[in-house]
């Protein structure tokens, strides 16, 4: 959070089902492999494979509620290596860019 202040929780004034569907579509559009998607548990788990070295990175998207709004939190972590040279942050920026499109 501190290193990437633009990657904060997003709040949407929409129905939970609509936000969840849009998140799932965004993940699929980005080419992520959906590992688990469970509307009832408000969670999507996915894997993205890097182009050059074929490293697998894990993404978890969770959904909550706040004052009749849907709160979306997304995290991306690399399975190998110490640093990712911003790949995880860029992955989440691409995801939220799709989520925030009208």
Residue locations for each model-derived region?
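Ser/Thr-rich, low-complexity intrinsically disordered terminal regions
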Residues: 1-102
């Amino acid at each position: 959070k501190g290193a990437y202040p633009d990657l904060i929780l997003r709040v949407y004034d929409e129905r939970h089902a609509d936000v969840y569907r849009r998140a799932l579509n965004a993940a699929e559009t980005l080419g992520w492999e959906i590992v688990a998607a469970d509307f009832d548990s408000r969670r999507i788990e996915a894997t993205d494979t890097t182009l050059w070295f074929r490293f697998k990175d894990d993404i978890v998207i969770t959904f909550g509620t706040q004052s009749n709004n849907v709160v979306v939190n997304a995290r991306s972590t690399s399975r190998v290596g110490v640093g990712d040279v911003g790949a995880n942050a860029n992955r989440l920026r691409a995801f939220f860019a799709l989520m925030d499109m009208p």
